[in-house]
Amino acid sequence: EGDIEVDVDTIHFGYPDGVAHNAETLMYDNVEQILYIVDKYDNSDAMGVIYSLPFRTDYEGMQVLTEWTKLGSGQYFMNPTGGDISPDGSKIIVKNEPFMLIWERNEGESVADAMARRPKQVKAYKKESQGEAIAWLDSTTFHTTSDSDVNEPIYMYTKNINDAVENVV
């Protein structure tokens, strides 16, 4: 009940090319304590570029993101609209309208290095119009939802991830 007061810190950042980008995917890695942003496209053959910024609470001035890797080319990687990193850091998921893609991350490996490999596609994806929200509960369960209507459901995916995916070609 009532209002809750919170402290808010602001991170001012820009992209290495100095231009604004269309990005809807913001992910935080608990393992490396790094923020990752995936933009929607870079006007080349690759769709979606991964950028990072080490997370701190004492930023001063403008921070410049580091460009890491491109997601890949083709329909699987077009217009990423959401993503998340599992709390233990072992899995990364990114979605667009037609696909959900999962990367498995090896111990000691960076998120960017893991995402430089080909992902696996979630076969059981219940397609959502305007499906942009996705969040891991743990390393085996995640939720998705859409913002296209007033009464949109929240989908929970709980199958063994290894049984629910197939390789992306």
Predicted regions and their residues:
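Sequence/structural signature of beta-propeller domains
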Residues: 1-164
